[in-house]
Amino acid sequence: MSADKKQNLQDTFLNAVRKSRTPLTVFLVNGVKLQGVVTWFDNFCILLRGDGRPPQLVYKHAISTIAPSAPVQLFDEEMGGD
């Protein structure tokens, strides 16, 4: 894969959970726990939607940990994760 086509792990992970609509638990650096599905992201923030509440725009620098509710396949089997 050429250098200009390489995606970083963060973008690969967020794109995979966005496409599969995998529910996430997001822990912020101040201890707040958010739950929802990623509907959009860019270099600085993530849009998180949850059941029955308006979407939340979360800045990435405020995130400590992201825990998906199910395993996430990041790479194709034939790629081998390289």
Curated annotation (Swiss-Prot):
Annotated transmembrane regions: none
Cellular component terms (Gene Ontology): cytosol
GO MF term set: RNA binding
Source organism, top-level taxon: Bacteria
Entry keywords, A to Z: RNA-binding, Stress response
Boundaries of every Sm domain copy: 11-72
UniProt function note: RNA chaperone that binds small regulatory RNA (sRNAs) and mRNAs to facilitate mRNA translational regulation in response to envelope stress, environmental stress and changes in metabolite concentrations. Also binds with high specificity to tRNAs.
Quaternary structure (record): Homohexamer.
Name of the molecule in the record: RNA-binding protein Hfq
Species: Hyphomonas neptunium (strain ATCC 15444)
Gene designation: hfq
